[in-house]
Amino acid sequence: MINDREDWTEMEHEKADIKKRMQYILNMRPVFNKEALFSDGTEYYRTPAEPKAGDTVTIKFRTQRNNVDSVYLVSQEQRVQMEICGTENGFDYYSAQVTIGEDIFRYYFEIQYGWVTCYYNNQGVCMKHEGRMDFEIYPGFDTPKWAKGAVMYQIYVDRFLNGDPTNDVVTGEYHYIGDKSVQVEQWNKIPAVMGVREFYGGDLQGIMNKLDYLQDLGVEVIYLNPIFVSPSNHKYDCQDYDYVDPHYGRIVEDCNEGILLGDDDDNSHAWKYIKRVTDKKNLEASNELFAKLTAEIHRRGMKIILDGVFNHCGSFNKWMDRERIYENQEGYPKGAYVSADSPYRNFFSFNDPNAWPYNTSYDGWWAHDTLPKLNYEGSRELYDYILRVGQKWVSAPYNVDGWRLDVAADLGHSNDFNHQFWKDFRKAVKAANPNAIILAEHYGNPEGWLKGDEWDTVMNYDAFMEPLTWFLTGMEKHSDEYREDLLGNSEAFIGAMKTHMRALHMSALQTAMNELSNHDHSRFLTRTNHRVGRISYAGPEAASEGVNPAVMREAVTI
């Protein structure tokens, strides 16, 4: 009886196979529509989209209606035949359920159509399975819901709005990179080529004054370039991580003297600057103003993220004190440049142990002596200090909603150390504010940092700014190169987008910072003129000559 049943089953399979063959011979089968095949990591096709270990996940796959014979969900552990769970608008939807363990869950789809077997992975349809292209689930990796698809507005504070002229940097207040600070009197003046010491007066009060405007624009997240104490207008050379620069905040205690005159370039004589940036009343008043700003931003239902520059600091930094600003100030220990006995000596790497006092032999990031590289491997105290900084600003009373991390992959002196630091940084920040985002500046493949225990996402250069710029303008994002072969090249554009989007994973992709341009690159509108060059040798006029606003509108629409 059992043998008869087995023989009958085998006969039925043979009949079905013959039927399929006849359908091909008679051209009765519908054409296989591989373009209809689809799945991704969004909540519609994966529920929950960001599962934790132990969760049961429903995974779905789409085909054209009545167009395939079977669909299988294939993982490293099992091959499960999926069942049709619905039909809508000419599509069949297949589903299967899996339980997620502690480890990364990788999967792909196997589609059978008559004699044809193909596969679907993170890159789309393929005829051969490639494991590196599988969909991936990192258990417990979730990104803040508020950041998914949010409209972000970047503010380079000094160039936004001068809301409080009493805190403006004045001409000759101090000396920096070869010359004295300059107070720009005319807001519309074109910035100098070496404009890091030119100040237009933008500040936090200016942002406060324009919140109605920003809200009316539909801004949901404000991203501020660095705001901590610093001698430059870009402030990627931090002087004190614990305080907002009083030139952006409040100056309640000032010095009427102490401007550098004539050839004097000794910042230990810059009494006005020293008073402004070391007096605790100014520093605390500036932090209080920032707390008021963040509270008002949150009251309006908006978010705010800060720029964290933790790979390096500035030569003015109180830990280094190359300018001897803190050397004789009460309450400040000697900087590592000043004394071999400084408590901060191990915060930096010095190449000449016999060069004190005033040791200039420290390592600078990319050899810039104004940007001392922080030596985390040499100081657990520094390591813990920066973790506390990460926590401080996302906690009360500031309650910032996250960090943009400058040159994040450069931190430390090895890849292993870099990854360990960002794992600890994530734990510290998320413990203080679970809904804070950790968004890194990164060029190249970020996969190694996007596994759920380091960064949430990145500034999306590779999967947005770069390919879109080449496609619409033929220009490199700094305006350093023009390639006519990439202008309007849809094949190159789609290929680049698919390749680089795969590296981000869906949670990171949904929260990535998609910009057309920013402070590190030429303006997108400038790129539409197809002119290679920079202000330093092409002149400022070249940036606006022959631009094409229509292309800019296309980019904004995308």
Question: What residue spans do the PLM features occupy?
Answer:
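Active-site groove signature of glycoside hydrolases
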Residues: 310-312, 386-414, 516-518
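Hydrophobic faces of well-ordered beta-strands that scaffold small-molecule active sites
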Residues: 151-153, 222-224, 304-306, 403, ...
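Glycan-association/targeting regions that enable binding to alpha-glucans and other polysaccharides
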Residues: 1-154
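Short amphipathic alpha-helices and their capping/turn segments at secondary-structure boundaries
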Residues: 12, 140-145, 208-220, 294-298, ...
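Substrate-binding/active-site clefts of carbohydrate-active enzymes
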Residues: 157-220, 227-397, 425, 431, ...
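Short, well-ordered coil/turn segments that N-cap beta-strands
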Residues: 218-220, 298-302, 398-403, 433-437, ...
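Active-site rim elements
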Residues: 197-200, 280, 376-379, 407-413, ...
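Conserved alpha/beta catalytic core and glycan-binding cleft of carbohydrate-active enzymes
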Residues: 316, 391, 422, 426-427, ...
